[in-house]
From Swiss-Prot:
The lineage of its organism: Eukaryota, Metazoa, Chordata, Craniata, Vertebrata. It is found in: Secreted. Its main location: secreted. Belongs to the heparin-binding growth factors family. This is Fibroblast growth factor 3. Residues 1-19 form the signal peptide.
Amino acid sequence: MLVIWLLLLALLPEPRVPAATASPRAPRDAGGRGGVYEHLGGAPRRRKLYCATKYHLQIHPGGKINGTLEKNSVFSILEITAVDVGIVAIKGLFSGRYLAMNKRGRLYASENYNTECEFVERIHELGYNTYASRLYRTVPSGASTKRKASAERLWYVSVNGKGRPRRGFKTRRTQKSSLFLPRVLDSKDHEMVRLFHTNVRYRESLLKPPSKNQRRRRGR
């Protein structure tokens, strides 16, 4: 079923991305707390992004982005906030960092919110979403402005079959690695969130850099 849907999706034209507009002042936070986006309303959606490659997207406090096969990983709990029409910012609840894509198409975890943290959220059939950089894309050279706009290729958030992020310019919206299912938090996730907000030792243990053995066990 997924294969048939992907073939149908490949026939559709690339979505047009709203252009980034200059803001009179830099937002302090994309979550509607004292920033310029508070008028867009509502608390962030707390979700886990489950890729069609079977990995949950993780945002680490050290700046790393990857995927995990763990069902309940603290760094896979995310806050997704609307910052413009069809545009979202994705923040790791436990790491406090934003998902971002640089001009080389690499995903990283940014300490501060900036335009590289803005992604076009597109909801597809079967419940899968795609997230494309608002700022960066592949634009063909040597073509007219009108043809360039129609031939632009978006750069997507993508996690491959080994849990590693793919560079944006190598991605396509029809690839399994670019499809994400937003999952609501389960009871264990909610308990981890509660401990994070109420237990100082628990919070400090999570934010402490992992040892070599811990990194080896996490693997992904």
